[in-house]
Structures are given as structure tokens and as C-alpha cells.
């Protein structure tokens, strides 16, 4: 998923949600467009890596850029599996335990590590090509089943569309990871939409969210997903990247 461990805010009850946004305020077209943009920008960033820079550190602790590429490939395939088996997938069974967010995060982190270790030892570009094919194929599956149940958590029904929002946010967050590894910066074209979409697909994290002050939604999402917005690899002259307009 989007983070590597329990989010920093996932420790206690209470708190407020970002601008009290709800999934109903995010259009299907908007989420799908942002989803496609996330896949596109990952592919664009991947083209900037060399054989050497694929081995560079990233904001994801202990993951090199090539590991992020492999993780993206795994997660895109996982999303297909979850949709194939919904609403009785292994993710749905995990969420139905109603475990707290930090426990869920640890279990998903172990799953991520096991899947990454099982991947073939291929190059970053090969992982990204497999990711892009899988992620785009998943995107094409979403519209016909958008309102169907994907899984539930503590009485909240997470639809296929809401899970698409979580996937959308995951792509943009990992785009930032890759950009930072290159010494660049990145933010999506509509960070508030991405934040709201992420919220819709992750009810296990809400409403245990604190610290929102109406500031920059992208910085907030980076921090909420366990990232340090100030993480720096190499700052070059490149002014950064923005998501391609739809």
C-alpha cells in the first residue's frame, strides 16, 4: 500500500478530517483521470533513471529506486487479485478482522516484503513496464464495477471506486518517491483530490487523523503516509515535475 509502516497519526481516537471532505465530493471521472496521471508520471520518471541511479536510495526506508519499481509491479498485480476475489479477497479477510491501523500496516508491510523478495531479478525498466501494463489494465476494469463492494472495515463498506482512490494515491506517492530519488520534486495536479481519494479507500485510518490545519494537502498526505516531505537525495537544477494535464 502507500506507506511502509503505521502512519504517524494512527495512534489514538479523535481528530478532524481534511476539510471534512467525503468521497461523494470526488467525481469518478476525476479519480480515474488522476489514476491515469499517476501511472503516466511514474513512467516518465522511470525514463530519467540510469543503470546506476536505479540503485539510489529513496524516501522509502531500505528501498532503492529499483525496489520501488518492483513494489509498484507487485501492488498493481495485487489490486487485480483483490478485485477478482472481492468481496472475499485476502485483503478483505484481513480488513474484516477490524484490527487497528498499526497492526494492519505491519501485516501489509510483511506482505510487501515477501512479494518483493519473490520477484525475478530484472531491471527497473522491466519492472516499470510490467507495472504500467498491469495498472492500466486495472484502470480499465473499474468503471463497470465502481459501486460494488470491495471490502469492509468496522462497518464501513469500501467500494471498488473507493479502492481505486487508494490506488490513485499510491501511484502519486510513489511517483514522489522516485522523483526525490532523482533529486527532483513532484506534486500531483490536484493534490486535494488525491488526498480525498486516499481517504475514501482507507477507512482504517479515519477518523483517527489529527494535525490537519487546512494547509497544503500534498505535504499533509506525504506526512500522513509516513514520508518526510523534506527528504532529499540530490538537489539538481531541474525545477521538478508536475502531473500531465488530463
Predicted segments — roles?
Residues 111, 115-118:
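Penicillin-binding protein/beta-lactamase superfamily catalytic region
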Residues 4, 8-33, 48, 52-61, ...:
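Structured surface interface patches that mediate subunit assembly and partner/cofactor docking
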Residues 66-110:
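Conserved alpha-helical segments that form or flank metal/cofactor-binding pockets of metalloenzymes
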Residues 44-45:
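Basic, often amphipathic N-terminal segments
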Residues 40, 73-77, 136, 172, ...:
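Solvent-exposed alpha-helix faces
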Amino acid at each position: 500500500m502507500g506507506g511502509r509502516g503505521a502512519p504517524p497519526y494512527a495512534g489514538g481516537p479523535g481528530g478532524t478530517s481534511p476539510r471534512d471532505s467525503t468521497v461523494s465530493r470526488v467525481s469518478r471521472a476525476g479519480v480515474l483521470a488522476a489514476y491515469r496521471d499517476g501511472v503516466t508520471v511514474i513512467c516518465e520518471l522511470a525514463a530519467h533513471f540510469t543503470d546506476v541511479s536505479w540503485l539510489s536510495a529513496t524516501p522509502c526506508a531500505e528501498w532503492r529506486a529499483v525496489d520501488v519499481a518492483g513494489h509498484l509491479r507487485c501492488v498493481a498485480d495485487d489490486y487485480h487479485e483483490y478485485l477478482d476475489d472481492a468481496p472475499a479477497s485476502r485483503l478483505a479477510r484481513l480488513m474484516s478482522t477490524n484490527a487497528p491501523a498499526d497492526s494492519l500496516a505491519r501485516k501489509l508491510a510483511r506482505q510487501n516484503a515477501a512479494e518483493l523478495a519473490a520477484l525475478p531479478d530484472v531491471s527497473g525498466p522491466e519492472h516499470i513496464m510490467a507495472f504500467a501494463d498491469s495498472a492500466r489494465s486495472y484502470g480499465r476494469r473499474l468503471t463497470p464495477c465502481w459501486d460494488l463492494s470491495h471490502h469492509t472495515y468496522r462497518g464501513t463498506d469500501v467500494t471498488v471506486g473507493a479502492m481505486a482512490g487508494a490506488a490513485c494515491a499510491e501511484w502519486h506517492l510513489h511517483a514522489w518517491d522516485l522523483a526525490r530519488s532523482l533529486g527532483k520534486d513532484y506534486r500531483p495536479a490536484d493534490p486535494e483530490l488525491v488526498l480525498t481519494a486516499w481517504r475514501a479507500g482507507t477507512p482504517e485510518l479515519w477518523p483517527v487523523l489529527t494535525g490537519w490545519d487546512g494547509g497544503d494537502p500534498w505535504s499533509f498526505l506525504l506526512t500522513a503516509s509516513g514520508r518526510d516531505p523534506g527528504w532529499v537525495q540530490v538537489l539538481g537544477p531541474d525545477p521538478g515535475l508536475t502531473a500531465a494535464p488530463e
